[in-house]
Amino acid sequence: MLSPAIKSRLRKLPGFRIASFLRRLTRDTETRNAALMLLRPPAGLYQPWGATSDNRYPEAFLSVRALAGDAPTTRILSFGCSTGEEVFSLRKYFPQATLIGLDINPWNILLCRYRKWRKGDARMHFAVAGSTTTQPSESYDAVFAMAVFRHGELNITPPPPRCDHLIRFSSFEQSIADLARILKPGGLLAMQNSMFRFEDTATASQFEPALSIDCSGPVPLYDRDNMLVPSPARETVVFRKRT
């Protein structure tokens, strides 16, 4: 296995991105579909490749469950749900709630719907979307946006001093404003593994912190000007919308 330093040098070689793209085309179907999507990136694309697993964020899941409760009227959104592991994990915490998963990759949603069909869960829904602009205002009790606002090509050693060649704070701030719009007053926004800080957005004034934890790893962090800044030891990962 190559060291992070060697990988970083390889990324700087001429033709690396083309070679990397061609390699992804020969891999599994999910990786191939993500690579093809990069040929014409859709609006709202941040992280092209899914990186998900079952029960990946138990602290945030438990916190939202304790604060939001669980009832037949509870509505929860997983924004950037990838292949559905997050949504199916949330079902264990919210057995009565309606769960909605949105993802920008049609292949991911196809897999999600197949898994839903296998489980026969009538209160679980999936749709292809790169934003929440079609969702009704104040319609969700909780929104999860985990490992969404990032890009894998920034997670190198050392990280690039700027991020705007791949992702931009202005796009992030626009996405966050719409996530806030669809939350009910008192609703919860869970966001983790982001390369931007929620607290740097204008929308943050509408929220108060609900859960802070130790940072899980060395994730590069960028400011409003898309410049690399030091990563903190702790981060707030659940926010409550003020009533």
Placement of each model-derived feature along the sequence:
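Conserved SAM-binding strand-loop segment of SAM-dependent methyltransferases
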Residues: 119-131
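Mobile active-site "lid"/loop adjacent to the S-adenosyl-L-methionine
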Residues: 145-175
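A short acidic, Gly/Pro-enriched loop at the edge of an enzyme's catalytic core
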Residues: 132-147
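Class I SAM-dependent methyltransferase Rossmann-like catalytic core
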Residues: 32-71
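Conserved SAM-binding motif I beta-strand of class I
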Residues: 98-103
